[in-house]
Regions:
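Viral structural modules
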Residues: 1-171
Length: 171
């Protein structure tokens, strides 16, 4: 289906009449990202500590009651990456990294006022991946992450301990 509605010009979709190269003066570069391998991991983690910052509204009255928490973006920040090629398996490597995911926590304070705060979760990954041969253009390792914490308990100060469901795709 075409969304081209003006048929008055010869530079539009449709049958080619005459020289198809007539009028072509633009060059277009299309860049695509090649994915060599991906690893999906789905887990339930208990005892994850969320240290809260950036309260809205500010200065809540403690103790806080946990309502929910979830990741604010699906892109994890990959740090502390270490790639060790496997000598017995060509183009495979052990990939170790820390993936940090920003979180938004919803709570009520001691006065019953609902608020939100920011936190983050750092997850250590240790996986085997297919990686390309060394080249001039380096490859990257990315993480797509979703974290949902349906339950948690107040510890002290601005801190919760939560149980969360994590889905992570390393590619």
């Amino acid at each position: 289906m075409s969304f081209f509605t003006t048929n008055a010009t010869d530079r539009g979709p449709g049958r080619i009449t005459g020289n198809p190269m007539n009028g072509l003066c633009e060059r277009v570069v299309i860049q695509a990202q090649k994915v060599f391998d991906a690893c999906i991991r789905q887990t339930q983690e208990e005892g994850i500590t969320l240290a809260l910052t950036g309260f809205n509204p500010e200065n809540p009255v403690y103790p806080l009651t946990f309502l929910s928490a979830r990741s604010t973006t699906n892109q994890g920040t990959v740090t502390n990456i270490k790639i060790d090629r496997l000598p017995d398996r060509q183009r495979f490597a052990r990939v170790q990294a820390t993936v940090t995911v920003p979180m938004e926590v919803v709570y009520t304070d001691a006065n019953g006022v609902q608020g939100t705060a920011q936190s983050s979760v750092a997850i250590d990954q240790d996986i085997i991946m297919y990686i390309p041969e060394p080249s001039i253009i380096p490859f990257t390792v990315d993480a797509v992450v979703s974290i949902v914490a349906p339950e948690g308990i107040y510890v002290e100060g601005p801190t919760f301990t939560v149980t969360c469901c994590i889905t992570m795709i390393m590619k």
